[in-house]
């Protein structure tokens, strides 16, 4: 470390030790908590299946910042820069539309070989991979229904796509030695008030059971399901609601995905984690930033991001919660978006690990809520930034906003040529 950072580090460690926090133990734990970065920030959820395709499914990437990735080589290059600017362990989350093939591949015919380059790249960079079937931006999802479709042939197509996706996910886990979390999200819903809310959910229930019927090694693959309140064009009814998927995950013992933008604006997923963990074996978190709706803005180091991290740490959910990000902002440099959001998630985890939780819990048990509030507020002023800077330097990444210099240089040399 440089002298100034080392001096600040030593003083900060003393301050935290005075309140009973072991900084070295906190950093050791932080190094066991990978954050899964989402590939789709790099190209506005376009994928490689049809570069001229239109994004559908009630989601939207707004903006036209130049330099978005147009193929897998460009996307991996962009990711490599982002990864080099973020300290600690990372993973990469892929959608099925990011397959690589010289010939068109139907979604229900995808195979592990279509993702072999991603696996080789992940091995090189010591990354785990996660996966998602892509039930959107396709002619057979154009009417707003996939796994709950009333047409059995269309429904079967999406069942087969999800089944094929599970095999790809298991391939990731087997090849990389770390389980791939495969999350199923579907856009199914209606713009206006439906007469029959039950039948689509009955079809979805049966379809999901068929999707997960093949037994896969849990050391290689983990199933997750994700709810949503509404989407563009599905404002009045969403088949896969919170209640539906909470019941499904609890009864089938799959993981449950909680997306920060998929609930009413007055709801927060940090308050849902402890309840859900009583009933499901695992949680997948999609940390995002909804602005008035599921806008998928870049994650900030704000109160909710901190609360999410604190819930994981306070309840020792390290082995049961999988931390992923889900945002896509096309109005700013896409590599910078990755770096900002992922560094913020890691900062939140570090701050949570530096909290004197045992001391605060004892105050709560004694009913001393005055001291609890006082210490909660005072610990916000402890020098966690000095620990963060030391952690960045130990991981050979820029300590502060100097990471932006690398992004600007890459933008001038590489992105401007696209």
UniProtKB/Swiss-Prot annotation:
Keyword Ribosomal protein included in the entry's annotation: no
UniProt key word Cell inner membrane: no
Record-level GO cellular component terms: cytoplasm
Localisation: Cytoplasm
Binding-site residues for Mn(2+), renumbered to this chain: 262, 294, 296
Pathway: Carbohydrate degradation; L-rhamnose degradation; glycerone phosphate from L-rhamnose: step 1/3
UniProt entry keywords in alphabetical sequence: Cytoplasm, Isomerase, Manganese, Metal-binding, Rhamnose metabolism
Cofactor binding note of this UniProt entry: Binds 1 Mn(2+) ion per subunit.
Assembly, per entry: Homotetramer.
Stated family: Belongs to the rhamnose isomerase family.
Protein's recorded name: L-rhamnose isomerase
Lineage, uppermost ranks: Bacteria, Pseudomonadati, Pseudomonadota, Gammaproteobacteria, Enterobacterales
Gene, per the UniProt record: rhaA
